[in-house]
Amino acid sequence: MTGVPVPFGNPGAEAQVWVDAHAARLAPLLREAHLAEWESAVTGSEQASAGLAQTRAAVKRLFSDPEGARRVRDLLDSDEIEDPLLRRQLQLLHLEFTANQLPPETIRELAELSAALEHTFHTFRATLDGAAVTDNALLEILRDGDDVARRRAAWEASKQIGRHVAEPLRELVRRRNAAARSLGFADFYRMELELQELDEERLFALLDEFKRATDTPFAALRERMDRALAGRFDTAPEELRPWHWSDPFGQEAPPEGAVDLDALFAGGDLVQLAADFFRALGLPMDEVLARSDLWERPGKGQHAFCTDIDREGDVRVLCNLRPTDRWMATLLHELGHAAYDVHRPGDLPFLLRTPAHTLSTEAVAMLMGRLTRDPRWLREAMGAELTREAQADVGEQLRTSMLVSTRWMLVMAHFERALYRGPDREDLNQLWWELVEEMQRIRRPEGRDEPDWAAKIHLSSAPVYYHNYLLGELMTSQLGAAIRRSGAEGWEGMGHFLRDRVFARGAQEDWAGLLVHATGEPLSARFFVEQFVAG
């Protein structure tokens, strides 16, 4: 980077000039990559998929420069960088440079394999009764259908994509592992955890602690749920199989309870409800919603997400909305991500203009997604009049939802680590069902030997990510407790807390430092357990 005036004899100022110049090169590349990701998801075109691979590779090539990596490392090793914001920017750059010290051909191949898998997920439609069907159509059958044979057919259809992507995904895992090993890591999974500033041993110790804390209450919950499902389908509890559940992966609880949450949203304007609510928080989302793509159509990606295009306010959400509790919660969740991105201070340095960590933005998103099972939100945002008994029922539905979803997250975290440790092992299909039976207590179909694990999009498009959902749920409960302790009044008080204690920090510190800043304590499962387990 020549031609940049550097203050002579001031190492901190010299470093800042270098960092700013690097950020200026990075910003347009990131913008192009995010636009390509958006175009690929909303159109499903092969041209957009090719553009996605090219733009992602361009970002990684910027970080493949060995001279830049050496410069950042030397600056961090010196004792002359005293400005904490500058040091944090250098730390983040170091993580990116570390992951990308790879040959251009390797970068290109990895980007192309990843984009091809995402393209398959965006465009694939399962076949049921000889016709292509959407994920939403399959979910409707699993949620409402009483014909067990048709439910089984719908569940099996939801797994069809696994056969199409399993081998390409294995190959991508092999290539990622080879790249990680060339950089000195045992495998890609361990590399990614280190680059996410997470310690693998401590992470899985926390996951094991969480499993032990929830084993007994979850077993009791499952016995109750199994009795209800067995009664609905006129069968014995031991005869229940995955297609008796309302979600293809069992990651959401079957609808139960006296309050039909789907009925509350039937015929409702989900977008208007969300817009009104975020205005009440003091975190308006109207411009985000105007830029977003919210409705189903052929060729469009079926997995919801939020993307920050440029760190300058161009934030968008992709959904495939239907008037259901699931999609209301999803829209609130994605707008939680968007609020974090939109309402960060614009004067932060570009490299710090992001959430502190994936788990911190997931925590905010989950805080919002939980609201469809919050009696106060249903009353004030929806105008729903709930009796005391109905409020208790909704609270129990939230507890059920949290236990079911977090036990599923354990499956994904343990399976993905095993996948990267041994992508060529012949028992991956069996391992998947062993984890499902252990963590979720869902019985495998007899004789089934299919790559059902590969049907989960995150393994292809968001590698080494799923543990952040569970950590995010723990942080959500911890944030909620801190908001209550703070005396924040009403929804606006909650919005102020998030903006001032979480969003305003950007990435100035790591996720652990942010959490202590926001709540006064390090991450603990205690708040989740007190909220959903101990009671």
Language model segments and positions:
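Post-HExxH zinc-binding segment in Zn-dependent metallohydrolases
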Residues: 207-217, 355-389
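Extended, well-ordered alpha-helical scaffold/bundle regions in very large, multi-domain proteins
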Residues: 52-56, 64-69, 193, 197, ...
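Beta-rich nucleic-acid/ligand-interaction surfaces
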Residues: 293-302, 352-362
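Active-site-proximal, well-structured secondary-structure segments within enzyme catalytic domains
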Residues: 129-137, 144, 170-318, 388, ...
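Glycine- and acidic
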Residues: 154-161, 193, 200, 204, ...
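C-terminal, non-catalytic "cap/extension" segments appended to globular domains
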Residues: 3-15, 46-47, 91-92, 187-190, ...
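Active-site recognition of the HExxH zinc-binding catalytic motif
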Residues: 323-342, 362-366
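N-terminal helix-rich structural modules
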Residues: 1-167, 189
